[in-house]
Amino acid sequence: MVLHAQPPDQSTETAREAKALAGATDGATATSADLHAPMALSSSSPLRNPFPPIADYAFLSDWETTCLISPAGSVEWLCVPRPDSPSVFGAILDRSAGHFRLGPYGVSVPSARRYLPGSLIMETTWQTHTGWLIVRDALVMGKWHDIERRSRTHRRTPMDWDAEHILLRTVRCVSGTVELMMSCEPAFDYHRLGATWEYSAEAYGEAIARANTEPDAHPTLRLTTNLRIGLEGREARARTRMKEGDDVFVALSWTKHPPPQTYDEAADKMWQTTECWRQWINIGNFPDHPWRAYLQRSALTLKGLTYSPTGALLAASTTSLPETPRGERNWDYRYAWIRDSTFALWGLYTLGLDREADDFFAFIADVSGANNNERHPLQVMYGVGGERSLVEAELHHLSGYDHARPVRIGNGAYNQRQHDIWGSILDSFYLHAKSREQVPENLWPVLKRQVEEAIKHWREPDRGIWEVRGEPQHFTSSKVMCWVALDRGAKLAERQGEKSYAQQWRAIADEIKADILEHGVDSRGVFTQRYGDEALDASLLLVVLTRFLPPDDPRVRNTVLAIADELTEDGLVLRYRVHETDDGLSGEEGTFTICSFWLVSALVEIGEVGRAKRLCERLLSFASPLLLYAEEIEPRSGRHLGNFPQAFTHLALINAVVHVIRAEEEADSSGMFQPANAPM
């Protein structure tokens, strides 16, 4: 791809943009946006529901924080300075909890929305009765800033690009005249505190918002624009009539870095952000295939969910978007889960995104004590800065998304006993060692401790991969992941020259496998959710994906087909049947999209490539208009449920799509099919 050497002259694009407005998007993403629009309306609650469908939000990131923008052009989720900080705009969880809208007055439904190709820069096209607008939104990226002194937050190796901590919005009127309005009403600390505005200079072009209580304990927001700002209580407003060729910029910043003061400066920052994203996406290896757009968008989303200073990968950008409409299954996913590590490394290494994989692995090494010679018991999850205490609390003053309560911050699962984490981290160590063809010396003590933990606890019950809040059980998938810990540990010990450990751990792995095959398989030859019960569980697809048994083992085939036929709704996979599982919660839940993508990969593994491809095509058709995924899908309506966008889902998408593509390629060649996570 040839990249511009200087910012494009937007005025030269005006005529072309005006002519192309009816189809102002490009490629599959643009078409998808247009085709999905009616579906989003029909799949939501009543048409006048003030909460947009979850799938209709756009996702932005600068690798240090994230935000969500509604179709109406309103920023409805932004937490600063970190993605797990308290929100300053939280309208997605309560319509009065803060917003920042920029768009035409009196119009709330855009003509088209798309990401600029290869980026997380949002472009929205608006038509009114009198004219057309194009709005672009980005969290700004710039050249690395900390030249004179070291960063206090970055632990990973500095890159060429760094977050500028500016939410930038630019507007161009490309035809006729349009009345533009801007409304910025922050609500600090999850709407527990209001905002106090004041002008920062003699003119109307800049204003500052602070929390009305203990302002020094909360971020200061600076609003800079070439509009005339009016301050009305907690709201900063602006309104102007734009004619063809007019430009507007609005920059919201929370940083020491200077915001743009003119439209030209804003256009330059928008261009450099585009350049940053396009340089990054060019690093990846993406197949020449019709599904390439889904792989690229998933890669961009995963990059957007990274916290660059530490290498952590957020499970999702949000908290408390409901898994059950108006239900209680609402959790805070703005943290880094250890179990995500294996799937992250599978997906990122597969696409050639080694740096992100290595940074995430370095984060895991940090929290496990490998990088500082400390002993830390491994937790299920951590804060993006490596924090170990994630105490859960409920925000009763917020209505919740579409009145799903409670809204939770923190996550009480951080101190649960979940035995799959040792297998996850050992598989991560193994994948990392394979990529480098060595076991880093500082990892061996940590590796050994995690294997010893698996040996000590594998016979005990736990809360399982799904973090159930009922009583601990002997979950079969947890035992499988304990086997993974011993199996990968033995392979790593051999690489390290520790023959005695390798022999000992391989023997214990065989013991665990024998126990699972005796107690975790029913009379049909199907793996069950827990010992002594015949309930199914989608996590048993990991039996084949982790190489616990080979794909041609009858028990593998029986399990994959049983899940495909018996644990699905309209062909999409449930985690488990809630009436068969004591998860400590009430209500139903949607199908888990990661499980459906796991099923795609598993079907390919057992040779059911045609069925896998059909399921994959169906899953891809459920993508949001911008090719994003929440945690769950309601199969009859296609509605997205749960936190958004979901890293786990996009990681499983990458693995599933690559499985299908490689199987297709293998059908046209004489070589041997290699699945995405094939062992050495």
From Swiss-Prot:
Entry's EC annotation? 3.2.1.28
* Entry note: cofactor: Shows an absolute requirement for inorganic phosphate for activity. The function of the phosphate may involve stabilizing the protein conformation and/or initiating protein aggregation. Unlike the threhalase ortholog in M.smegmatis, does not require Mg(2+) for activity.
Q: Kindly give the SUPFAM superfamilies that the UniProt entry links to this protein.
A: Six-hairpin glycosidases
Protein's GO biological process: trehalose catabolic process
Gene3D superfamilies to which the protein is assigned, alphabetical: 1.50.10.10
Q: Name one GO molecular function term.
A: trehalase activity
Its cofactor is: phosphate
Spell out the GO cellular component terms annotated for this protein, sorted alphabetically and separated by semicolons.
plasma membrane
What keywords were assigned to this record? Carbohydrate metabolism, Glycosidase, Hydrolase
Q: Which catalytic reaction applies to this protein?
A: alpha,alpha-trehalose + H2O = alpha-D-glucose + beta-D-glucose
Q: How does it assemble?
A: Homomultimer.
Identify the PANTHER family for this entry: TREHALASE (PTHR31616:SF10)
Instruction: Sum up the protein's function in the record's words.
Output: Catalyzes the hydrolysis of alpha,alpha-trehalose into two molecules of D-glucose.
Family under the similarity heading = Belongs to the glycosyl hydrolase 15 family.
From the Swiss-Prot or TrEMBL record, give the protein name: Trehalase
Q: Which organism is it from?
A: Mycobacterium tuberculosis (strain ATCC 25618 / H37Rv)
